[in-house]
Amino acid sequence: MTRFTYILFFALSFQCVCAQRYSRVHLDVSKTEDLSRLKEMPLALDHAHWKLEVGEVVIEVSDFELGLIQQADIPYHVEIDDLEDFYSKRLRQQQDIVWTKNVNCDSTSAPLDPTNFELGSMGGYYTYQEMLDDLDSMHSLFPNLISAKELIHTFTTEEGRPLYWVRISNTPDTDDPSKPEILYTSNHHAREAAALSINMYSMWYILENYATDEDLRYLVDNVEMYFVPLVNPDGWVYNQTIQPNGGGMWRKNRRDNGNNTFGVDLNRNYGYEWGGVGSSGNGNSDVYRGTTPFSEAESQALKWFTEQHAFQIALNYHTAANMLLHPWGYTDNFECNDHDRFIAFKSWMTEVNGYLNIQSSLLYEAAGDSDDWMYGDTSTKPKILAMTPECGTNSDGFWPPTSRILPLCRENLPQNLRGAYILLDYLRVEDLSSDALSVQGAIDVSMQRLGLPESSGFIVDLESLDPAVTVNTSAKLVSGLSYGESILDSFNYTIDTQSLSNPEVGFVLSVNNGTHIFRDTLYKRVSVVNPALSIDGTTLSPFENQGSSSWSTTTEDFVSAPTSITDSPNDDYENQTTQTLLLTPIINLSNAQDALIRFAAKWDIEADYDYVQFEALRVSSTGLPNDWLPLCGKYTNAGTADQDEGMPLYDGVQNTWVEEEVDMTEFLGDSIQLRFQLVSDNFVTGDGFYFDDFKIYIGGSIDSVINNVSDLNGLDKFATIIPNPAQHAIRLETTQPWMGQVQILNTLGQEVMNYSLDSESQQVHFDVGHLPSGSYYVHLLNADQITIVLPLWIQ
């Protein structure tokens, strides 16, 4: 200990924490010495929000801990004075709110909530008895899939409560040594309310979907899934007692330490590197580690339980930081031996919820936690690949609003299931191709070995569900991959447009591991292959800054040389700013049958706070606009309470270029405008948002696609087709001379005519009498890479 730490320990060690008040405070650690002192202090920094770019840490602390901060002379200000009162009032206000999905985004991959999962009576969270009743109901309804709740040996807590466990398996009453095992726990810390709900939700989902989901049935038949849903029952009941509507801030268990202090932090009481940094020997502290390793009945019970089994993976649920953490926690001086393996499978586990995938100590060093002991101590049990999900955002806090319970459960369900799939022979196969198909091309896929067992290989195949679509590539044998290794491949296809009855076509992408076939159905649509509007980022036009916005082209990075478009060229974006970039042409989808937008993008935006949205505005027939609607793409995620909550947006870090794709079919029949908008708060900033090669694809329209074409690159170049509809010949007239290419395409994107205008002209004649009756597009492409599209109807 430093002299500073000793002084604080003895000065405060005799204060009672029987009726502590908790506050949310912002610490100013812009000075290096203040940050160093903070890291030495016995505070629960594992749930702090670190904003070191602006020299700030946001933390929820007790009166005792606030006293430590004051004596350390670290500057701070209080955001919320009484957190129990704040959480309790917020939960009471939210009791009658029903959460609904983001209607702007495709939800086909979202789970259907289990019918037996219900919100509890404690602000939406379970009471202790409600949890026990639910475990009994699970066994009563699904006795062939889940065991009756059982005590962990004879261990009881300070207040006489046992710890319960259940097993989900197709043989739930038998411990089958041939099956790999995974452990799920919740609530080492009593106040982290969402953790219990997440695991109870997952259990109900597995039980209810076993009969109808082939992949889930394969998982349950071949893996034993163990749940200890409440590690800290005494602390949970204490919070229930002091705040029956939810919001209690007690973290530790309820041991009477004998010196007028109560409670041990169970996640500092494990034996691996016990007693080190991030824990305290002071019973007042929220990170009090106890008198000895495993001094507590709760940690003893978990130790004994893991020693009776051969768990390969463990997920110990906590809240809140939107992270999935792995060892080491006690030091950041080096990585664990399985660091690369953790990173590989955690990247898949967090694909849906977008949680940060890092080593625990990179957030904050903490000795004596569950993950380090499960992974590091192999003297009495095998090594366990243990992880800690920290679920929810900083604004969710320890007691998220009632309306956030289901979203948190939903976003962690794939994480729970994928953690179990890793125990099997598993190959991750991802479709990398566009949702819009040309008449012929390829479905590109990536394939990565993520299953822990050694594999003899996989057979990967793609089958068409439409007789008009032929897959020309045979099934592939994938073998010899090292763990986490990823390869790219493709399946070629052709489409017989004459026999195609529906523009939407389906494929089945399958992976056979020798004992089970995983199947994923891909839905694509045959659409126009040439864009109605193409902007290569060489100039800002036809985009236009709104107000004082400063979007511009940049040579910093691009997909197509020499520039792309970004919100803050050659610099980070500013704090407390809104930067809006409007696409000035109005897009007319009045008679379109299909619409799609693609652009290349990359970004560096403060996660959970700042964001960029790509939005559309319906322009009504009266000329009065409706509200701007955020658009959902392949790479958007739902906003937090500190952003546009629940709406699709871009945040976090995407360092490499990705091809974003936005389905616009919900706007068919409308005229719309489009814009990009960046919004920032007053703290951390980043490099911002870049996009390039922006293209709008329109299918099936017989009306003009782009209005206000005079705005394109500042050129007043508008074209007219006479006559239209036509039978034999057409005359194409432009208001100003035009030089470039003229293409005529059918609605499937096939080029049926091509004509070069080698000299500037305002009029050209075409014979179209040989074309079949129907809808066509006339594309005018100039040297500036601007495409104007006009409809043509042949009678």
Stretch-by-stretch model annotation:
Residues 470-500:
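Intrinsically disordered, low-complexity Pro/Gly/Ser/Thr-rich segments with frequent PxxP/GP/PP motifs
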Residues 427-437, 531-544, 575-576, 697-722, ...:
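Residue-level detector of functionally pivotal "anchor" positions at catalytic/ligand-binding pockets or at interdomain
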Residues 495-530:
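Terminal connector regions
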Residues 589-604, 612, 671-680, 694:
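Extracellular beta-strand-rich recognition modules
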Residues 531-580, 628-659:
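Extracellular glycan-recognition surfaces and repeat-rich motifs
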Residues 4-5, 15, 19, 712-795:
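C-terminal outer-membrane/trafficking sorting elements
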Residues 28, 245-440, 470-471:
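Metallocarboxypeptidase
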Residues 609-611, 680-699:
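Extracellular carbohydrate recognition
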